[in-house]
Each structure stands twice: as structure tokens, then as C-alpha cells.
Amino acid sequence: MSLFKARDWWSTILGDKEEFDQGCLCLANVDNSGNGQDKIIVGSFMGYLRIFSPHPAKTGDGAQAEDLLLEVDLRDPVLQVEVGKFVSGTEMLHLAVLHSRKLCVYSVSGTLGNVEHGNQCQMKLMYEHNLQRTACNMTYGSFGGVKGRDLICIQSMDGMLMVFEQESYAFGRFLPGFLLPGPLAYSSRTDSFLTVSSCQQVESYKYQVLAFATDADKRQETEQQKLGSGKRLVVDWTLNIGEQALDICIVSFNQSASSVFVLGERNFFCLKDNGQIRFMKKLDWSPSCFLPYCSVSEGTINTLIGNHNNMLHIYQDVTLKWATQLPHIPVAVRVGCLHDLKGVIVTLSDDGHLQCSYLGTDPSLFQAPNVQSRELNYDELDVEMKELQKIIKDVNKSQGVWPMTEREDDLNVSVVVSPNFDSVSQATDVEVGTDLVPSVTVKVTLQNRVILQKAKLSVYVQPPLELTCDQFTFEFMTPDLTRTVSFSVYLKRSYTPSELEGNAVVSYSRPTDRNPDGIPRVIQCKFRLPLKLICLPGQPSKTASHKITIDTNKSPVSLLSLFPGFASQSDDDQVNVMGFHFLGGARITVLASKTSQRYRIQSEQFEDLWLITNELILRLQEYFEKQGVKDFACSFSGSIPLQEYFELIDHHFELRINGEKLEELLSERAVQFRAIQRRLLARFKDKTPAPLQHLDTLLDGTYKQVIALADAVEENQGNLFQSFTRLKSATHLVILLIALWQKLSADQVAILEAAFLPLQEDTQELGWEETVDAAISHLLKTCLSKSSKEQALNLNSQLNIPKDTSQLKKHITLLCDRLSKGGRLCLSTDAAAPQTMVMPGGCTTIPESDLEERSVEQDSTELFTNHRHLTAETPRPEVSPLQGVSE
């Protein structure tokens, strides 16, 4: 609230139950009188137009009869009134009145009164335009730089700008991407129209661009605009303000500069005429109207802002200069010269309270209401407290809002995978080259403790693995029931899945006393499928393109003991070497060293190494656990194969780019196909037969192109899905090698998996490359940052498909480099602080320049040869196979 209230100079109440808005008030010398005094023009939604010329005998007097110069019923709602040079052949001011379906321009002339009734005004219609569309608002100005006259631009409710050159209609243009109309203003300095769209951004359109754009006599679709002649309407500049705008106004202080003022719902903006922000002021209250005006004496631009607290604030830039209290909420505010009094503030409320006031120091008569207090009765408070505590205890007992402990699970879920194949394979519609694809049965058992309704079981496995049934529904009408379902899993397509792990998820709702609909709960149980489901014994290979070596701290184990189900006829040869043949076609060889504690895995494809390597480590852990050995550990001392990993990333990214190009080309051909169809339809409907001019041939050719492109898009999507599966396999392998290389803990491995494997499914809108790049950049900025300077870098907030993969590959290389130099993966708040690390001798700094970064990308595989001396030799806790373990 303000200490002072606005000093009332003149006021009146307009009509009875009439409504007004910000466009209903205007101040101007509408009758072109010689003294230059402004008149108050007010229009209402009831269709009444009034013109006032206040002449109070003393300050604070109400309206007299002679103050009303004109009152006329126009019979149509008045949306906006403006005064300008709207009639050709003269530079006299005329009144423009905007109705919902009509624009009228009137000539207003004053008549001196010879009796006590005072002066009068007469209004004559000069011309009118009937509108084809429902109007919303209008603006005027010297469009195109014309001299001595004003043109009018009307914005319709469906987004069309209609320009009128005085008595004639010029043209109409639709705003692109229009949804809802916003405030409209004209800047004479830049010859542009400014509005605020429903996208919450300020948009500027050049008048010249509007004039030469494609005609909009009827709204055309985007595809027609592309194929038609003429230019498309292009926005000059935009600025996102993040909120809807109440009003927009342009003020020119001098000929060299102008400012665009925008009043938002919570902020007040001042922009340059090129869209750059001069300043912004956050408002602590809800504004209702505003008016920027030039202060010639101070050489600044001041702004009047009214709000819903009956206040009027005066700002000089962002500085509050004065605050005054009004008797009403203003919806429109103007400043003018009335009765030789300059700077009169005229405000209008939505219910017709019109007031002329000026600033002063009359004290506000507002008094705060007395606080109603009552004496406290402590006995009643004790009783109320006990009742509330009882309610809280009841809620805790009924588990209405609190999560239940693990001991009180409503449902137990267990999964058992059959050790043998199905006698009759359940595989159907397979695309694998082998004659017979095996299947294995999985049994899921559910046992309830309480009554549950509509428990839904969903089972998920990694593609190209397929389930015979993946959705089940149960009804547990009585406690302690046991339900068992069975389904089969098999390999559907001819490539290798990225994981052999499946997940069974049960969702249900448990009703309580306070929540009869039930509390939603989810229980999941993971299970592991056997390797032999996708793999057969194969012939070992002596040579291969890709090899990795796993070191252990125990003596080598016979491969026959680790993989008993993959032994062939010559068992003696398979003690130290064993071959595997995936159903998808890949061949992998595992060799156990006779003299050292090492195992080598080799294959022709890099991503095919993952499943066998992971299976080897898991079976080694199981073997030594059965032997009672607790200090078994695996490690990796070779170089991280980043170059092979980057090749898979590039191939996946190339398929994504190719998919975008194919979809864009398909969209263009579809537009062309529909355009030819319309031309043919017009020819067939024509009463006078005309030659088709090979339109039928063109239609047939375009149809074949659309079908071919659709097939190409479908084929590319299949290749992209397969490439993403291979990329996930390679990513799992790289994470495993980094974990063995740096002896990472289970929590640190989980952070790497969350960063490198954030998506279950890859799409064009949100792909693997941009998501992983954002996650790795966050790690480099926080827990792996070198200094506070790196922490201050702002990451891109939008996940867009990148131009190439160079930035992603550079970040992956830096991640490995910083891990090798003592970096610690952690998500705690203190991890973002710079850490002091004692570096061993011979360690170089991280390359930061462009040349160094290029060398890192080229020689990434040579950087990480052996960094075992950087970390202590502590055994890494490994996760046992997840065979039927519920969470």
C-alpha cells in the first residue's frame, strides 16, 4: 500500500452495469479545437460512445452535465477507439471506432453553446469497412513511411492482419504459427508491427515483408505456400519472455532510438527496436495496465503501471519513483492536457469508474482492520491435540500414506528359469538363419499376503529376444494364494542382444481405510537367461580382429569346468581354448593361459566380445565362491579400445542422420503427391473436359517414389534399431573394462551405466548421442572437474541432435583420461568441489587446447596403456548373477 492517495481532480461513473477494457479509453484533440485541449473518448462493450471535456469548478468536483460533449449508442460493442489522420485529402484528426465486425471512422466537430447547456459535439460517419473476420484489436501509424496520413491495421481473432489505407482495403496476411491473439503495436522507426504470440514470445514483422508476402484472402496450408508463387511471411526477430503479455507500447524519445515496452503477467520489459533487452523489472503484484511516456524535463521515459491492489506505480526505468492509491482497479490509463492542466492522469475501471487525478501528498485513509483475538483455553487445546495424535496413529497403522517395510510385503514374486530347452520350441516367425531356434521356459510365481485386485505382471527382455506372452492379470480375492504363470523366451532376429537379463514387474494397488482406491505399488524381480539360448559350441579361431585380455589373481581354471554345456567331442583341446557360435552368426574364442593368470577373448566384431566376457567373469566368480575363495578379483591392464567404440558410435549416428534425410524427403514427396491429386480432382470435376497434361503419369511416378521412400525409412529404422543394440553391447563392454581398469566400486559403475546407458529406446527426437553427451558433460563439470572455472561453465539446456560426434568422442576421451589421473565418480554435493590430488610422476596435464584435443581424439587408444599404479589394489565387489532375486 501507499502512504498517499491520488488527488481527485474530476471523476464520474459511466452508465449502468457497462463493461470496459484497455482499448476503450483515448485522449486526443478529437474535435481539432484551436486551444489544443484533449478530450476524453470512452467506448463501452454495451455500444455507447462518450466524449468528455472536464471543467471542474474546484478540485474534486464530480461531473457536470456540460462536461459531457457527446453520448451516442452505436448498437455494436466498442472494442477500441483511436484518433488519427484517417481521412484522405486532409490532415485533420478523426475518430476510429473498432467493432467486432466493422471499422467506422467519424468526423467530430465542436459547437459552441449559446445557452447554459454548454458546448456540444456532432459526429459524422466518414466511411466504414465491414470486416470478414471477427476483430480483436487494432493499431495505426504511417505504414511504409507515408507522410501526412495514418493507416490502420486490425488483428482478427484467427490471426489475420488486415491493413486499410484509409477508405480502401489494402491486404491481409496471416501470422505464422498463430493460436491466440495478443497485443499489437506499430513502430514507426523500424516500420514494423510488434505482437506477443501464444508461444509467449515478442515477434516483429516488417511492413514491407507483410506487403509482399503471399496473399491471405483465404487461409492456406503450409504445403500450398511452399508450392505457390509469392513470398512466405517471415518474422523479423523474436524474443521469448516466458509469459503472456497484457499490453505492448512503443515510445520514441528522439529520432535516433525507440523503446518497446511489454507488460507481462509478472514482469515489465523494455526492449530495443532490434529485440534486445534494455532492462527487465520483476513485479511483486499483478499488473492491470500500463503507459510509458516521455519526460522532456528529465530526459527520461517514465512508466505508469496500475495493479489489482488499487495502486498506481510510477517507474523511471527500473526505479520506483512514486506510488499512489486509487479508488478502483484501473484497466486503462492515459496522460493528457485537460483545461490547461498538463499531465493529468486519466484512469478507467472495468465497471466504468472514470477519474482524472494528479499526484500529491494527501494521506491515505486506509486503516488496517483489528485483529480478532480470543483467550486460549488450554484444556480444549489438550483435547484437540490428543484427537490429532490419535488420527496420526491410525494413519500409521493403516499405512494410508507411509510406505510399508520390506517385512510387510503384500506380494512375493519369484522367477525360475528352466535349465533345459523346451522339448518343442515355441519360437515363431523367427528371422534367424539356423534351422531350429531353441526356446526356454520361465516360470513366475506370485504369492499374496492380503487381498489384491487387478495385479498386473509385465515381463521385459532385451530385443531381439522375444516372449510368447508378456502381460498377465491376476485377482487375489483371498490371502495366501499362489499363482504361477509360464512363458517361453527365444531369439527372434539374427543379431545378438545386449543383455541376457530379464525383468518381471508387478503393479497393484492395496486399499486402506483412508484410501479405498488403493495405494499404487510396484515390485520387480530380475532373472538371467542361459547363454546357450543364443549361443552354440563353435570351432575356435586362432586369429581375430579384436582381442581383450582379462587378468586375475588366481590360477587359471579349465574352460570345461566353466562352460560344461559348450564342450564338443575333443575335450582335451578345450581345456585352455573354447569356441562359441552365436545364432546371429558371430564367432568368439576364449583362451586360458597355461603359464599366467590371464584369459583372452577374441572375435571379428568388437561388440560381440561383451556377452562372453561378462559370462566368463560371472562364472569365474561363481567358481571361486564355491571353492571358498573370497579374495578373487579381475583386472584389465590393456588399453581401452575407444577407437573401435567410436566407429560404432559413428555408424549409429550416420543411420540417424540418414533417417532424418529420408523422412524429410518422404514428407516432400507426400506434399507433392497430394498437390497432384488436387490438380487431378479439379480436372475431373471440370464440366469442360481438358487434357490431363501427363498429370496421371506424374501421379503414378510420385506414388512409386513415396512407396520406395517409405520402404527405405522402414529399412533404415530396422538397421538403426540393430545398430543401437550393438552400440549398447559395446557400451557395456567399455564400462566393464573401465571398471576393471580403475577398480571402480559398484556405486561408481552404476554412475557410469546411468551416464552411458540412459535410454531403453532410441528415437529421432531424443537420441543416444545428445543424451550421453549431456550426462558426460555434467560429470566433467562436477565430480571430474579440474577447477572452479570448469564448474562455472553453462551446459546446453536443450537436447538437440548434434552436427557430428566429435564433441561426444572428445568428452568420452576426457572422461577416461580424468579417471586415469585420480578422478572419482560421485554424486554427492561435496564431489563438485575441486579435489587436491597427488599425481604420480610422469603424469601430464589434461589437453585443453584445440591442437591437444585433436591429438587426444586421434590417439585415444594409446593414452590408456597401463595405469594400475594410480589406484590401490583393492578387490572390486562384483555382482552375482541375478537369478530370481526380487527387489
Swiss-Prot record:
Region (Interaction with LZTL1): 685-765
BP GO annotations: cilium assembly; fat cell differentiation; protein localization to cilium; protein transport; visual perception
Xref: Pfam families: PHTB1_N, PTHB1_CtH, PTHB1_GAE, PTHB1_hp, PTHB1_pf
Compartments (UniProt record): Cytoplasm, Cytoskeleton, Microtubule organizing center, Centrosome; Cell projection, Cilium membrane; Cytoplasm; Cytoplasm, Cytoskeleton, Microtubule organizing center, Centrosome, Centriolar satellite
UniProt site positions, description: Critical for protein stability: G141
Stretch list, region Seven-bladed beta-propeller: 1-407
UniProt keyword annotations, A-Z: Bardet-Biedl syndrome, Cell membrane, Cell projection, Chromosomal rearrangement, Ciliopathy, Cilium, Cilium biogenesis/degradation, Cytoplasm, Cytoskeleton, Disease variant, Intellectual disability, Membrane, Obesity, Protein transport, Sensory transduction, Transport, Vision
Protein name, as recorded: Protein PTHB1
Species annotation: Homo sapiens
